[in-house]
Amino acid sequence: MARIAGINIPVRKCVPFALTYIYGIGIATANVICHACEVDKRKRVSELRDEDIEKISGFIRQNYVIEGELRKEVAMNIKSLVEMGCYRGVRHRKGLPVRGQRTHTNAKTRKGRSRLPIAGKK
């Protein structure tokens, strides 16, 4: 396993797909990183030289918020919405869909399992 930005990425995969194992980097961002670092997208991680890995790692560190920092930032954004009491914050607090989706027949995952009363002894 190669280590980029503190994350072990699989060596058998092509570089852009392997970079998506890092939280905050999708396939489009991974392609931009490969282009900026002049790394062939068809290369596998195992074929990269150490200086290529260092170049990719440095580019990510300088230009992107990833992993723990990104998770913390997202959590703080949600927390501020909840504290403001705005519509999106209320939806987060209640555990309902936030972006205007229908909830009458869908949103089972977001709403959770319905709790049916369990019949006791008579």
UniProtKB/Swiss-Prot annotation:
Keywords annotated in UniProt: Ribonucleoprotein, Ribosomal protein, RNA-binding, rRNA-binding, tRNA-binding
GO CC annotation, single: small ribosomal subunit
Gene Ontology BP annotations: translation
Listed SUPFAM superfamilies: S13-like H2TH domain
Any one Pfam family match given in the protein's UniProt record, by short name: Ribosomal_S13
Family indicated by similarity: Belongs to the universal ribosomal protein uS13 family.
NCBIfam families to which the protein is assigned, alphabetical: uS13_bact
Complex formation: Part of the 30S ribosomal subunit. Forms a loose heterodimer with protein S19. Forms two bridges to the 50S subunit in the 70S ribosome.
Protein name, entry field: Small ribosomal subunit protein uS13
